């Protein structure tokens, strides 16, 4: 049986590395690249066009626009890109936070209930083929840990990272008590670089599904 995947992304963000030598590449091209590699039977629903003004919409109106795309999906992939977040616009007036919010809610339609989706954040390279805007590799010279710059994300996305209820940490003495390094699957929203994801996407989708099966171990934040 094919997977039903919802993809949330910033349509118009061109601050990404060119695909196949195309210097007008946008995030949408990365979505198309993934779609071309999925198995027959897998189905993708894409997020809303980001040019639409949400400021006058009520919650119910937003849900009406999203419900058919999200309700039947089992996993939501969020494409993280450098300019995904409009800095001078309220988060409530942007589509991505709402798409994440509804992906996390248990929803009922026509007597059938859909549980919270698995979530996976796929981090796209910026125009310089770098992931440093979000992922800092080897941030500690002793334990070679990775730092995720979650402060750059939408609030709902940030709050669903490092949100495991009973965290475990490594024993690196180079980190203070308030800056300990998490181990294991510490985030409900797992992050992966595009370069690692695209040729092994089945593995990472399964990781997200496994986390979802243990969602009670995480504090889920569902509000925009």
Curated annotation (Swiss-Prot):
Keywords attached to this Swiss-Prot or TrEMBL record, sorted alphabetically, are: Antiviral defense, Cytoplasm, Hydrolase, NAD
Q: What class of enzyme is it?
A: hydrolase
Specify whether Cytoplasm is a keyword of the entry. Answer: yes
> Which Enzyme Commission numbers does its entry carry?
3.2.2.-
How its function is modulated: the record gives: Activated upon phage infection.
Q: Which GO terms describe its biological process?
A: defense response to virus
GO cellular component entries: cytoplasm
What are the subcellular locations of this protein? Cytoplasm
- Molecular function per GO: hydrolase activity
Describe the task this protein carries out: One of 2 TIR-like protein components of the Thoeris antiviral defense system, composed of ThsA, TIR1 (thsB1) and TIR2 (thsB2). Phage infection activates this protein; by 70 minutes post-infection with phage SPO1, TIR1 generates a signal molecule that activates the NAD(+) hydrolase activity of ThsA (tested with B.cereus). The signal is similar to cyclic ADP-D-ribose, but how it differs is unknown. Expression of Thoeris in B.subtilis (strain BEST7003) confers resistance to phages phi29, phi3T, SPBeta, SBSphi11, SBSphi13, SBSphiJ, SPO1 and SPR but not SBSphiC.
User: How is the subunit organization of this protein annotated in UniProt?
Assistant: Homodimer.
Q: Which family does it belong to?
A: Belongs to the Thoeris B TIR-like family.
What is the protein name stated in its UniProt record? Putative cyclic ADP-D-ribose synthase TIR1
């Amino acid at each position: 049986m094919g997977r039903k995947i919802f993809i949330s992304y910033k349509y118009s963000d061109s601050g990404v590395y060119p695909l196949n030598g195309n210097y007008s590449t946008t995030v949408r091209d990365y979505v198309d690249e993934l779609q071309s590699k999925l198995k027959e039977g897998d189905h993708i629903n894409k997020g809303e066009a980001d040019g639409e003004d949400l400021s006058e919409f009520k919650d119910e109106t937003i849900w009406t626009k999203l419900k058919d795309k999200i309700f039947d999906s089992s996993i939501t992939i969020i494409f993280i890109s450098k300019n995904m977040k409009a800095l001078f616009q309220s988060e409530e007036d942007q589509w991505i936070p709402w798409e994440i919010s509804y992906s996390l809610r248990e929803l009922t339609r026509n007597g059938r209930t859909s549980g919270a989706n698995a979530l996976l954040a796929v981090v796209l390279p910026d125009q310089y083929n770098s992931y440093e805007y979000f992922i800092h590799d080897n941030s500690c010279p002793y334990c070679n840990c990775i730092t995720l710059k979650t402060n750059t994300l939408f609030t709902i996305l940030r709050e669903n990272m490092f949100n495991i209820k009973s965290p475990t940490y490594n024993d690196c003495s180079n980190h203070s008590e308030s800056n300990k390094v998490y181990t294991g699957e510490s985030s409900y929203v797992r992050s992966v670089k595009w370069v690692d994801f695209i040729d092994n996407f089945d593995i990472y989708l399964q990781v997200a599904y496994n986390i979802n099966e243990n969602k009670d171990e995480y504090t889920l934040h569902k509000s925009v």
